[in-house]
Each structure stands twice: as structure tokens, then as C-alpha cells.
Amino acid sequence: MEPVIVEGDLIDEDVEVIVNAWNRNVIPWWLLLPQGVSGAIKRRGGLAPFRELGRKGPIPLGGAVLTGPGRLPFRAIIHVAGINLLWRSSERSVRDSVRNAMAIARAKGYQSIAFPLIGAGTGSGKPERVLQWMLDELRSIAFDGKVRIVRFRGRG
């Protein structure tokens, strides 16, 4: 599989499921001020995905969990724990996040998925390095559907 790299807003992608780069889910979601993709999900999709996520409990580093999309036009959201408790990403957390998100997508039969650059925002990972880790991992996974990696482009 060869992922397509695009520039834009993940929330505007025409896919069945999006990936949200989240945290370990040990701090109650309502105590956090979501940024990046999480902030966009909250603003445009409402609180339902985060309430559902909060009921899932802690997520292992690199783990992934599925929630509904709230008011967003997707079938679901896959939240990945791409950053550790110190809010930092690593090669392992990024690769594990990609692999576990794809495992959920395949198990659920989704044919299209869009990823942000996991760990490149809040996680302080260098975007080019994170992109390479993600590409390497995605290329090693058998998937017949469409995979997009979205580099954020702000509005305005």
C-alpha cells in the first residue's frame, strides 16, 4: 500500500474514518484543552467522542481505541496514544499507533482512513521524521483501501 500525502485539514477529508492523535487517556478529558486535531473534533464534532473515549480508560502508549464520530461525517474516529505522560512522541509510539490504528480499520472493514502526523504537534516530533516513520510502517501493512496522511494547513 502506498499512502497519499496531502496538505489540508484532516476533518475535511473524504474518508470513512479519521485518526486522532490523543494521549494515554489517564487525565480526564474534561480537564484538557484539546489542540490540533482533538480541538477540531471538539469544535466541529462535539463532545460525544471524548465522553465515549473517557469511558474506555487508560490507553497503552501506541494503543488505539475506536469511538463514534459525534457530529462529524465519518463512520468512526480511531484515537491513538501517540504521546507519553510527558507529552512526547517517539519512533516506537508513532509506529505502534499507526499499526494499531490500521488493525482496527481492517478489523472493522473500513476502506478509507486519514491520519494526521502523529506526535508532530503536541508531541514535539519533527514533522519530516514523523512522516517517514509513518510511511515506513504503513508500507509494511497489507491494506486494500485508501490511506491518506494529512499535513495540517491552517485556514486563512
Give the ranges of each region predicted by the language model:
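Solvent-exposed alpha-helices and their adjacent loops that cap or buttress functional pockets
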Residues: 9-12, 69-72, 139-142
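Phosphate/ribose-phosphate-bearing ligand recognition and processing surfaces
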Residues: 83-156
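Short, conserved "active-site rim" segments that organize catalytic pockets and cofactor/ligand binding
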Residues: 10-57
